[in-house]
Design a protein with these regions (language model features):
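Short, surface-exposed beta-strand/loop "edge" segments at domain boundaries and coil↔beta transitions
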Residues: 11-15, 57-59, 180-181, 208-214, ...
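Eukaryotic nuclear/nucleolar intrinsically disordered, charge-dense low-complexity regions
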Residues: 185, 374-390
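Intrinsically disordered, low-complexity segments enriched in Gly and acidic/Ser/Thr residues
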Residues: 119-126, 295-343
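Charge/polar-rich, low-complexity and marginally structured segments
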Residues: 103-115, 120, 302
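N-terminal ordered "arm"
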Residues: 1-45, 195-235
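Structured domain cores in non-transmembrane regions
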Residues: 30-102, 224-296
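Extended, well-ordered protein cores
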Residues: 124-200, 207-214, 326-372
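Non-Sec secretion/translocation targeting segments of pathogen effectors
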Residues: 150, 345, 385-400
Length: 400
């Protein structure tokens, strides 16, 4: 979305670092460490001096040049703007100039309401201007209602009815929009759920009731990003943290087994990383496997996810006859001949497979396990590894 050159205002001789925002997930940790080498990148302070900006799709961001910002604020802003379409970027650019904003925290606030303004950059097509303005003001409408709308008349009413502010991006009409503080300068606001996100959580100090004093984390992510979110939320250690699910791409059977309230944030992150390349059918299969194996925590489910190929799954199969039919016609284990259809005894073969596989029917179909370990052994996590994770997650004395 944009590139910013960041440096320390008090130690400019240390040099500057060019950072692309939003920071690619796989580069986040290295970027933070590189910023720390320049004595910037603090989790809470606005200690990054923006030396220059390159933002071809959002030139209004150049107004941040020379200002101070927090690295995670810039990362959040880059991610938010990445979700904007072409006209929404036009609205944002024009609104930045209209309201004379330049600081990253101000632009975060604006990103929540910039879509409320109407920007007219071409007065030659008043029909389009009017219909677009109508959609902005009303949010949505029936397609027939929009088709029957006199766009030109609506545009003329807009132009004559409220003052317009000329910017290099077009004429801005506020539509009564008020710029309000959505970001409290401590806790980053929630943001759209990324495509690669599997689980979104709200984290806060146990017993904290103020909804503003919490952080949103999207898993999987880097450990350092989780630790920084904990610090922003004032969470000193995992034992002082309360987690709530905000959104999930896991099937219900997995969500029910997670026990997020008493689980480990870092185990949940490991689970999501294990599922990062899953397709829709893999998630469905994992849900069926969870119903069969009955895991009790994220570590158990991660072991199942990492060993999913040791399970066979027949979706939407709930009777021995359906199982027999699936195995013969769809599993690929046999050459099915439709001319012999009347000779197949699907029910008997289904019963035989169930007894042979020790399989079970669950909500989403039939599942069986063919590994060499018992299910309990398969799900058993390495206790030494879990202990190390918890030790690394202790935040006391951590410096950024």
């Amino acid at each position: 979305m944009f590139e910013a050159k960041l440096k320390s205002r008090s130690q400019p001789k240390l040099g500057a670092l060019a950072v692309t925002f939003p920071i690619p997930e796989e580069r986040y940790e290295n970027v933070i460490l590189a910023l720390q080498n320049l004595q910037i990148g603090d989790v809470r302070k606005q200690d990054c001096c923006i030396e220059s900006i390159r933002a071809p799709d959002c030139p209004a961001l150049n107004r941040m040049t020379g200002t101070m910002a927090n690295a995670d604020e810039l990362d959040w802003l880059g991610k938010q703007l990445e979700s904007f379409d072409r006209y929404e970027l036009l609205q944002f650019n024009a609104a930045v100039e209209r309201f004379g904003l330049s600081a990253a925290d101000e632009l975060i606030d604006l990103s929540f309401c910039a879509r409320e303004v109407t920007v007219v950059s071409d007065f030659n097509d008043l029909e389009l201007v009017g219909k677009r303005h109508y959609l902005i003001v009303h949010g949505a409408c029936d397609p027939k209602e929009l088709e029957n709308l006199d766009g030109k008349e609506t545009a003329l009413a807009l132009i004559s009815g409220q003052p317009g502010y000329v910017t290099r991006y077009g004429v801005v009409y506020d539509n009564g929009m008020k710029l309000e503080q959505a970001y409290d300068r401590k806790h980053l606001p929630p943001i759209w759920m990324a495509e690669n996100c599997i689980l979104e959580l709200k984290i806060r100090v146990t017993g904290e009731d103020d909804p503003k004093k919490q952080e949103w984390v999207q898993l999987p992510t880097s450990q350092i990003k989780l630790e920084r979110a904990m610090l922003r939320a004032g969470i000193a250690s995992c034992g002082e943290m309360q987690m709530l699910v905000s959104d999930s791409r896991f099937p219900d059977a997995v969500d029910c087994a997670l026990d997020v309230e008493h689980g480990s944030l870092f185990e949940l992150n490991q689970l999501c990383r294990a599922c990062s390349n899953f397709k829709k059918q893999d998630f469905v299969k994992l849900g069926a496997v969870c119903q069969m194996a009955k895991p009790t925590c994220a570590a158990n489910i991660r072991q199942l996810a990492e060993n999913l190929d040791q399970f066979d799954f027949a979706p939407n199969v709930h009777t021995p006859e359906e199982l027999g039919k699936y195995m013969i016609q769809q599993s690929g284990h046999y050459e099915y001949d439709e001319n012999l259809e009347e000779f197949y005894n699907y029910g008997d073969y289904g019963v035989k497979r169930i007894l042979q596989d020790d399989g079970v029917f669950v909500d989403r179909g039939y599942v069986c396990y063919h590994g060499t370990l018992t299910l309990d052994e398969l799900m058993r996590d390495d206790p030494a590894e879990s202990y190390q994770q918890e030790q690394e997650a202790k935040m006391e004395g951590m410096t950024w």
